[in-house]
Amino acid sequence: MRKILFGIFLTLNTVLSCIAQQKFEPLPMDPALRYGILDNKLTYYIRHNETEKERADFYIVQNVGAILEEDSQNGLAHFLEHIAFNGTKNYPGKGIINYLETIGVKFGANINAYTSLDETVYNLKAVPTYRSGIVDSCLLILHDWSSFISCEDDEIDKERGVILEEWRTRNTSDRRLWKKSSQILYEGSQYAKRDIIGDTAIILHFHPDSLRAYYKKWYRPDLQGIIIVGDVDVDYVENKIKEIFADIPERVNPATRIVYDLKKLDTTKVCILTDPEAKYTIGNITYRHDAMPSEIYASIVGYTTSVIDNLISKMVNARIDEVLKEKDCPFSYASMSYGSQVKSCDGYELMYVVKDNRCMEASEKILSLAEQVRRYGFTESELYRAKETTIASFEKAYTERTKAKNNSFVGEYKRNFTTFEPIPGIEWEFDAIKKILPSITTDIVNKRFADYFKTNQITVLMTAADKDKNLLPSENQLTQLIADREKIAASPYIDKAKNKPLVKKDPKPGKIVDIYHNPKLDYTMWTLSNGAKVIIKSTKLKNDEILMTAFSEGGISTVGDLSILSSAKIADNIIEANGLGDFDATQLDKALAGKNVTVSPSIAMYESKISGRSTIKDFKTMLQMTYLLQTSARKDPEAYASLMSQYETVLENRSADPMNDYRDSVQVLSSSRNSYTMPFKKENLSEVNEADAIKIFKSLFYCPEKFTYIFVGNLAEDSVKNEILSYIGGIKSSKSKQRGWIDRGIKHPSGFTKCEFSKTLSTPKSADYFSYMTDMEYNLKNKLQLAILRSILDYRYLESCREREGGTYGVAVRQSMSVVPTSSACLKIAFDTDPEKEALLSKIVKEEIDIIIKDGVRDDDFQKAKEALQKSFAESLLENGYWKGQLEHLEKYGWCDNPTYTETLAKITKEDIRQTLKTIVDAGNLLEIKMKPNK
């Protein structure tokens, strides 16, 4: 690694002056950040940010994780994370959650934590800060999580079942393969022994003192970082941190926080694994290197190296994207990236999803792409595009620096604490990138790429389904392929970019024939001469963001011929894969390099839609792409064949995952087995025809008179008028007589419907689904009552099914309302559990509903639910996406939330909620689906 860094250092010393004199000086810290270390060695980061008015995020980062467990503690780092929510010195029992939910901060969405191998992080997000007492309380919670978690015996015993159910839910094929591969590829290191969730036998039987020992040993201020970002008084918060955390002493003779190494390999390490529920055959080739020393990583040399690595990643993956579009490409997806493997080890990783069991061919192909770059290097045009894309992303971040969200800062500060990532701030970074990029040459990136492969620490992993075991290559074959890498055929790359305008000839502009202004919601609507409606709402919520949505009634429901239904279902993906106008998809990607713009079509059952996003500078490009979508969809047999091949790979082993049968059952039965909503499967591919898909797409999108185009963001009507008239008004009207959606009989089943089936499962579990449906008028009050009901059921199921019974990791409750084809409401409930507990939990789920109908809603649940909705509403007002959705809703249904939301919410009573639930249940339309393991 030192040779690699020294090579970069020498190459860049003509680019970056005085590096030698700096002796790897760390980059400056963002001056807008308040950073400090208390006498007890606790680190804190505080930043004032008003983007989210009267909101702040509070984090405590523990620079320890499962990797530090002793063998007898396997799984206890994660267990402790759970116990932290079950009682602390100042918040006994469920005090943390109960208090925070009274101010609208919800468990799960805003109150959460995670444990990884090397860190454990607790967070309180979007906390209201309109009272200093709330800030004090959140700091006290962080204080308790630091050193005063109660770890009471009874709470530990109750949580054992919850952890076991989390294991049951998360023990998927991917996780099993990851665990097995870690044991082999990381053999001889601590990383081979730990998997976070841990040993279930230990989880069920460990003595509470073992958990307390882990807590006492590793949760200490020198390994903890406090992060507070948001609408707070920085001086006040800093003083409160010093005051509140003063009672935590510096640890005397603390245990060393070891950074574990990986065992050095004597030869290429190959690991081939299968699992009965694996859906894909996946290859992974990694060239390991020692991690960059932290003092270099935090310096200008480390920063510049990261810039070079990112440029390489962009260029290599652009080449992969080209290859993926080839008809005979042996993999359906692939990527190459350089990054951290574990704390002590970086690596260059080649990942690919194999098509049609062509394992050796796919492995050789991905290596040939790497060899192509290593031997012949990158072209000037590729580097130019990568630089343009990079500078565009930095420019966007710089322009939006006063509108950045709290979580963007939190992520940077967390990585600074755990990995020493520099945090100089976007002002410094934007200035630096403008100086660094022009001086990075193809020679520099080519040298860096070649150095990726100068290591003998190589691992190869291939995973697949059990049924494909005999089709996999041997370890010897893969080892030999790596050894013979330099013999693989590779030819120089030919860049086939098109240097021409997106739109060959600008269309004749349309005219505005009618103007309407809505003063309440402050938007303007134009009706254009081609029949299109355009809605514009100017906001300053973001400095450089414009969102677009264009929608039309119709969608898949307009397709009457069932023989072309499969073509209709994936027509939008076919159009995107084929490119637009004179540009195939690869050429289009290259033409858009350096532009912050996305435009994509979608076809739902009852509507067709175009979604877009751009900066101010790239607004015209967004309109041009929209124009091309609605005038210039193209046929591309090779791209189409490649897409079909990718679909085949995805769908081939779809049934291997037993949860797909469960999800399919929900989809099929929820719509009464309607042909239009059947899951898309491999056999449907033979029904797809490119010409049919394009014809369907044109019938749905080549009709501007049926579309309403909504633009929300930092745009002024006068500045965008001419471009809208050209690229929206210039789309020719159609002569289609089709108007709106068609009722195809898709409906929730009436009465009681039950489906119970069994599957062979690697991890025994039962999965239950309940869906209650009733006719209900679609209005704001009913919509809010359903949202409140969902939260109330969330609270009750958390208390009964998870906390009291330890029977499930969580009960998912969802509510929905439909207008098309009929106005209705649906309440959906789902959970996974131990098969032995399924009957009990199923009974509890229904009992909780019966209790609410009989006894009414608990007052504290009701108030918490309403407070959370009001808080969420206030936050949504600061998002362009919210306003875009509101204007779309208004145009479709004649009303939207905004004008009367708070007033309507305030008037809802507990009796309203009880009656709403009673109405849903009394309708008698219950769909019940149960999947159980084969005995």
For each of these PLM feature ranges, what is it?
Residues Y99, F148-I156, T169, I440-R448, ...:
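Peptidyl-prolyl cis-trans isomerase
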Residues H78, N310, A568-K569, A787:
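Proteins synthesized as precursors that undergo proteolytic processing into mature forms
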Residues Y45-R47, E52-E69, L76-A77, K94-D144, ...:
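M16 family metallopeptidases and their MPP-like homologs
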Residues C18-I46, D233-A298, G302-V307, S313-N317, ...:
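Proteolytic maturation boundary segments
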Residues H205-K242, T677-P679, L685-S726:
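Internal metal/ion-chelating core segments
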Residues E81-F85, E576:
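Active-site-flanking alpha-helical
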Residues M1-Q22:
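Bacterial Sec-dependent N-terminal signal peptides
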Residues E155, R160-L223, I227-V229, V234-I241, ...:
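Hydrophobic, small-residue-rich alpha-helical packing segments that form membrane-like cores
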